[in-house]
Amino acid sequence: MSLLQFSGLFVVWLLCTLFIATLTWFEFRRVRFNFNVFFSLLFLLTFFFGFPLTSVLVFRFDVGVAPPEILLQALLSAGCFYAVYYVTYKTRLRKRVADAPRRPLFTMNRVETNLTWVILMGIALVSVGIFFMHNGFLLFRLNSYSQIFSSEVSGVALKRFFYFFIPAMLVVYFLRQDSKAWLFFLVSTVAFGLLTYMIVGGTRANIIIAFAIFLFIGIIRGWISLWMLAAAGVLGIVGMFWLALKRYGMNVSGDEAFYTFLYLTRDTFSPWENLALLLQNYDNIDFQGLAPIVRDFYVFIPSWLWPGRPSMVLNSANYFTWEVLNNHSGLAISPTLIGSLVVMGGALFIPLGAIVVGLIIKWFDWLYELGNRETNRYKAAILHSFCFGAIFNMIVLAREGLDSFVSRVVFFIVVFGACLMIAKLLYWLFESAGLIHKRTKSSLRTQVEG
């Protein structure tokens, strides 16, 4: 890449970054937080944060990258995607009418809410316990990170339930919403994330998500400033780099350490070059249609229920890894959101996917606003826990693609909804057995006087 070509790419990158950052800043000033703000920051991180890192790798370490015209296509496709997404998100689908009293779809009380978070936490802890009994601490047993996907590791399906510890702790926080509950959320979820990091063998997702939710709650409540958020972001990047070194068993120093930091940080937070690789091989892609979305559900079907279930699932990430990169190491390489759309339907699917994503984020913000307006604090805690708990799925959306997002968000909704139903059933059983007694002011006064 020549300096002239880099200059042209830099101008396009700067314009796209300023365009998205400006719209995000205006939205932040208006509402302080919603899921449009979160997705916009996530989109910036995924598709634009990596460009400066790539530039340093090219000019400082002479690393090979896709041709400049392909990198230009990647930047422009990301910018156009966001423009279509933003218009869709801001388009009002129906006229605003005065809020008329409507019968709520469901309601919650204190006992049901506490039962819900206990069940969610129980699912996570039991899953971790069973996985640990089968495999021990994989971080200290395996020689390479790719081995966690091999037949040596049993009970891999249990990892999908680990994440429900975070929604459980979110319910606990939203029931109190003070600084002590906020700090308890951070300590409990990060400790759990470090535990799963050691047990699973290097998975950092729970740590990243817990830290991100902690920061956004702090921004919403005014407990941290934007400068503190930026400092925490830098600290998070350094922390993820250190965990990546431990995961891959790397011991580096000097120029090698700087080089490793650049490419690991780029691959962790901003795999935008993967989109460029897909565009570079555009003519060789056999468009998959909506099949990757259907196939991604296969991993949630137990083999005893479907004996003939394919052992290898050809979703967009695996198609990109196996068919485009010809990589059969056992690791699935992230195609990014736009890359998954390219795999499914080429350039035509990019604006269509942007419209779909705009509607998805609009739906999450609608739920979030319902929680903000809810007068029943127990129901509000459940709604907010669901919305913030889905942040993991939004990260999957930006990094892994639409197909991975759909299967995971459906799984999240089913498990979360099942926990709600079980909590309500248990409450009904306890109440029928006479074990539930409503609190009254007189009984509370008697307890205090006694």
From Swiss-Prot:
Pfam families: WzyE. Keywords: Cell inner membrane, Cell membrane, Membrane, Transmembrane, Transmembrane helix. GO terms for biological process: enterobacterial common antigen biosynthetic process. GO terms for cellular component: plasma membrane. It comes from the Bacteria. The keyword Cell inner membrane applies. InterPro entries: WzyE (IPR010691). It is a multi-pass membrane protein. The chain crosses the membrane at residues 6-26, 37-57, 63-83, 118-138, 155-175, 181-201, 207-227, 228-248, 341-361, 378-398, 410-430. NCBIfam families: PRK02975.1. Probably part of a complex composed of WzxE, WzyE and WzzE. HAMAP family: WzyE. Belongs to the WzyE family. Probably involved in the polymerization of enterobacterial common antigen (ECA) trisaccharide repeat units. This is Probable ECA polymerase. It comes from Escherichia coli O1:K1 / APEC.
